Amino acid sequence: YIGPTFQQAKDIMWNMLKELLHGTDLIETTHENTATMKLVNGRRISLKGSDRPDTLRGVGLAYVVLDEYASMKVEVWEQIIRPTLADVQGGALFIGTPAGKNHFYDLYLAAEKDEDWESFQYTSTDNPLIDPKEVEVARRTMSTQAFRQEFEASFVSFTGGIFKNEWIKYDDEEPEDGNFVIAVDPAGYESVE
């Protein structure tokens, strides 16, 4: 399991792993400092951080979870993890919140077209554990782009501008001849596709 940093990986997954495996006969040893478990079948479960990519080299892997992949450097997958999985034809699961149209977006699109891969998209708005009222409060108080990215798992080009799209009003009728003032928002830029 790889998170953006070792501490994040440990904070997110370590206690959950210990709870899931507690009381089973699967664990041979547990090492708190390195967040590693050795299983009775000889396999290891280790938590790592992608912020120190060289610590990921030289370790045999059968399966890896890359959490918050959009926050990782693409080289972590392409130059370190992917080659390491090759000798055992290992697998990988990429999870996280989109962060614009970066390498996570590219991988998501490629996986939709490749029969050896699968793409999934789950939104917070569909999560039964999140109160719909909280979702509506977030929708009202966040920018459209931030809400779409954080709650709807949309690959939006988030610019962090201060104006919500729905606040902008316009008229379909062309104006008459005359002098006009045009306001420009220098707070952000979003590409139009």
Residue positions per predicted region:
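Loop/turn-to-beta-strand initiation segments
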Residues: 44, 61-63, 88-94
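Walker B catalytic acidic pair
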Residues: 67-69, 186
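Short, flexible loop/turn motifs enriched in small residues
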Residues: 189-193
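Inter-Walker segment of RecA-like/P-loop motor cores
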Residues: 7-62
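ASCE P-loop NTPase helicase motor core
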Residues: 71-142
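Catalytic acidic motif of RecA-like/P-loop NTPases
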Residues: 7, 70-71
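ATPase catalytic-site recognition across NTP-hydrolyzing enzymes
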Residues: 127-187
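Conserved RecA-like ASCE P-loop NTPase motor core of nucleic-acid helicases/translocases
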Residues: 1-9, 122
